[in-house]
Amino acid sequence: MSNVTVVSHPLVQHKLTKMRDKTTSTKTFRALMRETATLICYEVTRDLPMDEVQIETPVAPTKAYEIAGKKLVFAPILRTGLGMCEGMLDLVPSARVAHIGLYRDHETLEAVEYYFKAPEDIAGRLVIVVDPMLATGHSAIAAIARLKHYGVTNLRFVCLLAAQAGVDALREAHPDVPIWTAAIDQTLNDHGYIVPGLGDAGDRTFGTR
């Protein structure tokens, strides 16, 4: 799968294991999500374009390099994407943030949009869509379709954990959008949850169950 990257760094895998553990507290789970998102963001942004610039250090003039172009946009899918977005902003604090509110209909498992807010010039920016879980793929597909409707062409999708079915669905719907994840699990249960997964990422992040 040439457009799917599994981030196998030992720190990412260690933190994901702790998140999978059902005995991990809400406080620890939230911190681990933020830390893991920062590490994955490092991989996602490793090919950002650079400009050569001239600066002066306290010792001498020198050439150096800065990220080129407009500031990128993180687009967390509410609500759980917010936990990952914080970790990414730790690494790229100047990034803009778009918010995409989606919930999953528990009868149909389809994504239903209830909120959308993005920078006015989002079409000209790299947009990284963020959602901890890629299960059925419906939310990711809907979020990316919404962004494309606004003219966004440079898109990436980042999650902590994916199901193979979700990866396949997203690749079929948006073959131009590369995917980064810490792991791919093979199955979904009848409720659309990833197995073995890590449970409901939203409830575990916000302590709502």
From Swiss-Prot:
Residues binding 5-phospho-alpha-D-ribose 1-diphosphate, per UniProt: R79, R104, D131, P132, M133, L134, A135, T136, G137, H138, S139, D200
Ways its activity is controlled: Allosterically activated by GTP.
CDD domains, per database record: PRTases_typeI
Entry EC no(s): 2.4.2.9
Pfam families, per the entry: UPRTase (PF14681)
Annotated family: Belongs to the UPRTase family.
Official protein name in the record: Uracil phosphoribosyltransferase
Gene transcribed to yield this protein: upp
